[in-house]
Amino acid sequence: MRQGRSRHKGGVPRRNYYRMDGDVGMAYSVGMISLGCEKNRVDAEMMMARLREAGFVLKDDAAGADAAIVNTCGFIESAKAESIEEILELAKLKKEGKIRALIVTGCMAERYREEVRRELPEADAVCGIGADGDIAEIVRRALEGEHPEVFPEKEKLPLEGKRVRSTPPYYTYLKIAEGCDNRCAYCAIPMIRGPYRSREPERIVQEAAELAASGVKELILIAQDVTRYGKDLHDGSRLPELLRRLCRIDGLRWIRLLYCYPDAITDELLDVMASEKKIVKYMDLPLQHCSHEVLRAMHRAGSRGELTELIAKIRARVPGIVLRTTMMVGFPGETADDFNELCEFAKEIKFERLGCFAFSQEEGTDAYDMEDQIPQEEKERRRDILMEQQQTIMQRWGESRVGQTVEVLVEGYDRYAGCWFGRSAADAPEVDGRVFFTAQGGKPRAGEFRKVLLTECLDCDMLGELVG
C-alpha cells in the first residue's frame, strides 16, 4: 500500500478470487493508494486485510495490480485535488490495459458520490466509507465487469479489525474512536464520518497487546478527537483510564496522543501524562485560532486569554511537554487585527511544533456561505507569514536542545548523508523533524532505542552523536 478483520456475521462470505482467463489458477492482485490522515490509513489497512483473507494478492504498487483502489481524502480542496489526480493517473493506466479495474472509496467518494460517479466514469466501482467491510466483494464485481456503487450507513464503517500494517514494524497507529460531534463551522468530517463512536476499551487494550507482541514499540492513539474518548460509553470509561491500562502492556515503550481537543483537556489526563513513563511528553493540540471572534464564528470555544491559561497549565503539570498545534488563517471575517493577534499569540506561546492551513471553503459547512470570504491569495500570504515566523521559533527551540542527551527510536540509515536517523519523543512520524546522528564503531538497528547527544539544529532537524 502506498502513502484489516475477520468477516462479521451476515457479511460477505469468505471466498477466493482467481483469474478466469488465460491465467487460470492465479489469484487477482490488488494495490491500494491511501491518501489523507492516519485515520484513513487505518481504514485502508483493514481493507487490505479483508482482501488478503479473501485470497487476493496484495501489491505495493497499485499501478502493477489487476485492481487499483484509491482511498480518497475529502477534507479540504488540496486533498480533493490530490485524490482526483491519483484517480486520473490510474485511469490512464487502465486505458492502456495495465490495470483491469479502478475502485474509488474513502472520504471524497462518501461526500461527493454523485459528482464522482458523473465526473469520473473511469472508476469501475465507487463506494462510501461504510462499504469498507465488503471491499473484497466490491473488487470482485469490478473485475468481472460490473459497476457496483455501495453506500451503506456511515455507522457501518468497521471500528476495528485485522490489519495489514503499512507502517514500519516498530510503530503503528491505533484508532480509538470514529466520527465527530464537534461541528466546527469549517469542517465536513461529521457529515462524512458520522457521530462520535468510541471503541470498547477491552478491544483497544487487546489490539494494543497484540501489536506489542508483534514488535510495536510506539503506539500512536488517533481519533477525530482522542480527548472525548468514552463519552458515549455507559461503563464510565475515559481516556485517562484507557491510558493507564495501555501503559501496563509489556513491550510498549512509547504511547503518543494525536488530535486532542483543547476544551476537553482535564487535570486527570495531564496527571496521567506526567506520571506514566510510557506516555511521551507530547501533545497534538489543534487550536485553529486565538481570536475570540474568529473562534466563535468557527463554533469553537475559547479566547486568547483562556488558551494562554490552558497552555500554561499543561506545561506546568507536564514539565518538558512538546506542544504541536495547527492554526487556520483566512477564515471568513478574519480581519488584519485578528491575524496580527494570532501571530502575536504564536510568538508569545512559542509552540515547539506548529502547522498552518489556509481556510478551504467546503460545501455543506456553515462557513461555506459566510460573508466576508477572504481572497485565496491573501489567505496564502497570511499562511506564509505565520509559517515563516514559526520556522524561526522552531529553529531557536532546536538550538536550545543542543547539549542534551535524548532517547531516539532508530529508523534507518541515510546512505547519502552517511549517518543514521530516527525520532525523539518530540517527533511524531511524518509531521515533525528527525534526529540524524553518527555512530562511531556502532551499528544501530531500526526499532532500537538509543541515546544520542544533540550537537546542532539544522532546518528543524537535530544532528547528534550516538552515546549509548
Tell what function each PLM region has.
Residues I204, L221, L257, L285, ...:
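Conserved, mostly hydrophobic/aromatic
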Residues R5-R7, G11-N16:
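Short, low-complexity intrinsically disordered segments enriched in A/P/G/S/L with frequent Arg
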Residues L102-V104, R111, P121, A213-D337:
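Conserved SAM/AdoMet-binding glycine-rich loop
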Residues Y17-Y229, E268, I279, M283, ...:
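Proteins enriched for Cys/Gly/acidic motifs involved in redox and nucleic-acid/cofactor modification
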Residues E334, E341, K350-F351:
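Contiguous mid-protein beta-loop-alpha structural module that forms a pocket-lining wall or clamp
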Residues G74-F75, R193, L233-G236, R296-G302, ...:
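Short glycine-enriched, charge-decorated loop/helix-capping segments at active-site entrances
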Residues D369-G468:
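Terminal RNA-binding accessory module
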Residues A63, D181, C290, R415-Y416, ...:
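Short strand-connecting beta-turns/loops that link adjacent beta-strands
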